């Protein structure tokens, strides 16, 4: 199947040159890393990032921090496992798909072999295109990856995993099998957990709540992420994808995590009465 983008022209520009200008702005923005990716890294081990998925004007500069780190740590052919929450309520509880996703920068090919093996080994995972057709949380990551590819940083395939079910046990299962399949297939992989943090709360409340779960991520405590999201009523939409990423990365040998940048929508709109939190976090 060839999937068409559903939020191009809304979350990010649909036209090639406008999108390129926007992504370059994200890197060079005062809230971004303030420099463009400029060199090919050397892949030595798997890399995980937490990346936001709002409109680029709000969260793109935050996301650019993570993609700058990816650019410095990849080379050759790389499979990007992209986990995102299912906002639409369509399709299976946990699903991947095969085929190609279109972007304004060109097509992104799914690693069908990895997706198929993961589906066969992970009982909670279905192959279901309906989960992905209208969902934006994975789509908004692809232009950043395709941009790195166009800079000859690496050649990417990806595996989309949409998570409507985000309970702890399911999330851990998904993470376990991602790591298992990556080892069995000897793939160079990066794992991207797509999430925003607190939604539509005052800046002070949102930043305090987000700091709690960010601390858990930085300490690689997957169970505490789930407990604190529930206990503190943190309206983080992709805690399941983050738990799965942390579990997979630990199984693949990760020992450290670093907060690259935290910001809120209020830093753009200057309205701090109702904000959404965004963070870029590196796990390796």
Swiss-Prot record:
It comes from the Archaea. Coiled coil: none annotated. Gene3D superfamilies: LigB-like. Belongs to the MEMO1 family. This is MEMO1 family protein MmarC6_1286. It comes from Methanococcus maripaludis (strain C6 / ATCC BAA-1332).
């Amino acid at each position: 199947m060839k999937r068409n983008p559903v939020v191009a022209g809304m979350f990010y520009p649909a036209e090639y040159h406008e999108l390129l200008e926007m992504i370059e702005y994200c890197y060079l923005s005062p809230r971004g890393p303030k420099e463009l990716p400029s060199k090919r890294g050397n892949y030595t081990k798997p890399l995980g990032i937490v990346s936001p998925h709002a409109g680029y004007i709000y969260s793109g500069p935050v996301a650019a921090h993570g993609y700058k780190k990816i650019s410095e740590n990849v080379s050759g052919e790389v499979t990007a496992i992209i986990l995102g929450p299912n906002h639409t309520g369509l399709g299976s509880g946990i699903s991947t798909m095969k085929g190609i996703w279109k972007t304004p920068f060109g097509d992104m090919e799914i690693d069908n072999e990895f997706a198929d093996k993961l589906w066969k080994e992970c009982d909670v995972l279905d192959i279901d295109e309906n989960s992905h057709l209208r969902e934006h949380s994975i789509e908004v990551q692809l232009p950043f990856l395709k941009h790195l590819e166009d800079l000859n940083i690496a050649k990417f395939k990806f595996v989309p995993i949409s998570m409507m079910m985000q309970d702890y046990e399911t999330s851990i299962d998904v993470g376990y099998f991602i790591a298992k399949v990556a080892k069995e297939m000897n793939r160079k992989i990066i794992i991207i957990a797509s999430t925003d943090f607190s939604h539509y709360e005052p800046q002070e409340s949102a930043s305090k709540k987000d700091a709690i779960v960010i601390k858990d991520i930085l300490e690689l405590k997957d169970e505490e992420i789930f407990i604190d999201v529930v206990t503190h009523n943190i309206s983080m939409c992709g805690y399941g994808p983050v738990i799965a990423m942390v579990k997979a990365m630990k199984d693949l040998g990760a020992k450290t995590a670093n907060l690259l940048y935290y910001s809120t929508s209020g830093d753009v709109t200057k309205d701090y009465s109702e904000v959404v939190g965004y963070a870029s976090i590196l796990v390796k």
